[in-house]
Regions:
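Lectin-type carbohydrate-recognition ectodomains
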Residues: 39-173
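Basic/polar, cationic surfaces and motifs that engage anionic cell-wall
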Residues: 1-44
Length: 173
């Protein structure tokens, strides 16, 4: 009589293959690992949501996906974007500035959620958005990739380097 707790390695009859099997001690150790807590990624405060659209070179308007406006890996410039941030369903006021090719810094007030130019084929090079102290964002810039996360009220991207922002990602910290 062979105890199941001592069986290790056997042949599967159904498909005639070798199966390494596990001892009871190994299975108990595995179950113990499953019971341990795991690290969980930070979660946005309840009720904060992002939505918007990006106006992309040769594509037009694209919806935000995974808190990201724009495209990555396609080499296409971000020309304009709209952004709506809600906290528990209430739209949050947004203002800020963008740095636009051949124009420079352009300030925006709380009466708009549209940043940039449409129909002028001008790249956005840097952004500064004021939308509350829990919002962070970063820019994906040509020839650089993703820049560092910045807080609301700080510049993301580059100025005076002639590099286009291709995407902007948002998160709550």
């Amino acid at each position: 009589n062979i105890s199941a707790s001592n069986v290790k390695g056997h042949n599967e009859i159904y498909n005639n293959s070798s199966c390494p099997g596990y001892t009871k001690v190994q299975m108990d150790a595995f179950r113990a690992k499953l019971a341990q807590p795991v690290a969980v990624a930070p979660v946005a405060p309840d009720g904060v949501t992002f939505s918007g659209q990006a106006h992309i070179q040769s594509k037009g308007w694209l919806e935000m996906a995974n808190n990201t406006l724009g495209t990555v890996g396609q080499g296409l410039r971000l020309e304009a974007f709209s952004l709506v941030v809600k906290n528990n369903g209430k739209v949050q006021p947004i203002n800020g500035s963008i740095h636009v090719q051949d124009i420079g810094n352009v300030a925006y007030n709380q009466n708009t959620n549209l940043f940039g130019t449409v129909g002028q084929a001008k790249r956005i090079e840097a952004i500064l958005i004021n939308v509350g102290n829990c919002v962070q964002y970063r820019a994906h810039t040509a020839n650089i990739g993703w820049g560092p996360w910045v807080k609301s009220g700080e510049w993301a991207g580059t100025k005076e380097m002639g590099l286009q922002i291709e995407a902007i990602e948002f998160r709550v910290a």
